[in-house]
Amino acid sequence: MKSNLENLNFQTSIREQVVPSRKKVKLPAWLEVAKPRLIPLLLATTLGGMALTEEWPLSSPKLICTLGGGALAAAAAGALNCLWEMDLDKRMKRTSDRALPSGKLSFNTVFLGAVSCTLAAAMLLISGVNYLAAGLTLLGLCSYVILYTIILKPRTTQNIVFGGVAGAIPPLVGASAATGHVGLSGWWLFSLVMLWTPAHFWALAILLKDDYASVGIPMLPSVKGSEFTVKAISRYGWATVFMSILGVFALPEGGILYLIMLLPFNGRLLQLINRLKSSPDDLEKAKGLFRWSILYMFGICLLLLISRTQLSVDFEHQSMQMFLSLKAYFNY
């Protein structure tokens, strides 16, 4: 009995370190429902989509309108998600103190806020960017709320595999904001995020599998167990690494430096996945993989931005000249 209690306390401690309780990290109620922790990474991948185009860097007004519209749409999606899952959140100890279940905000207040953010996002993107960027942003919002939250999440263990399309749309928004169309490079980053999402999310789901099981949400670890889930994480992790390497062909220039800087990111990702494979129920290892996966995607987007600097272009030219010189020397 004592051993079980200690294990439960340990699991709770790990969860609190990864997904802090709202009691420990206080946010204003109106900000909490917008899920602001999710927005920075969405904006980072939007910037990544922009950096893959010939038009990078964008003018300041267009950049601000794109990121501002994306942030507003993401806030609206988060609020609508909270509205739909309000009854579910009441039943989980981890989420029962959120703004809606606890009564800090009313349903009507949050709904009006979500509608206002959606309209503001659409107006900002249409007036300051273009119709395609606005349409893709609203598609991302709808896919998160309708496809993932309402349709897939309560019905299938593959909810995040297909529902991950919502988180993969920002690169398309970034590319379309820059050029007026998406292009193959934008689709590459879209594909990378799609492959990265299951490995990222399932690492978190291992930590929260008991919470999901208690309310009947069929997350993969809750239904199939940690060992099965980690095998799936490994497959998606390797697919992510392979797709990330293809980024060298997606970049207009600076691909050589990108490829070199990418190596430690991929190495660390695979290392953490292998550690979790050796102990699928080790929550500390799941926590480590989850946290690194966030840094990994931020890192990829940063590498894309660095690769478009003059320093990277000069490095690529010098590398090519060195290669040609060595080739000529050995041929001689």
Swiss-Prot record:
GO terms for molecular function: protoheme IX farnesyltransferase activity. The chain crosses the membrane at residues 63-83, 109-129, 132-152, 160-180, 188-208, 245-265, 286-306. It comes from the Bacteria. It is a multi-pass membrane protein. Pathway: Porphyrin-containing compound metabolism; heme O biosynthesis; heme O from protoheme: step 1/1. Its EC number is 2.5.1.141. It catalyses: heme b + (2E,6E)-farnesyl diphosphate + H2O = Fe(II)-heme o + diphosphate. Keywords: Cell inner membrane, Cell membrane, Heme biosynthesis, Membrane, Transferase, Transmembrane, Transmembrane helix. InterPro entries: Protohaem_IX_farnesylTrfase, UbiA_prenyltransferase, UbiA_prenylTrfase_CS, UbiA_sf. The keyword Translocase does not apply. One of its GO terms (cellular component) is plasma membrane. GO terms for biological process: heme O biosynthetic process. The keyword Kinase does not apply. Signal peptide: none annotated. Its main location: membrane. It is found in: Cell inner membrane. PANTHER family: 4-HYDROXYBENZOATE SOLANESYLTRANSFERASE, PROTOHEME IX FARNESYLTRANSFERASE, MITOCHONDRIAL. Belongs to the UbiA prenyltransferase family. Protoheme IX farnesyltransferase subfamily. Carbon 2 of the heme B porphyrin ring is defined according to the Fischer nomenclature. HAMAP family: CyoE_CtaB. Converts heme B (protoheme IX) to heme O by substitution of the vinyl group on carbon 2 of heme B porphyrin ring with a hydroxyethyl farnesyl side group. This is Protoheme IX farnesyltransferase. It comes from Prochlorococcus marinus subsp. pastoris (strain CCMP1986 / NIES-2087 / MED4). The gene is ctaB.
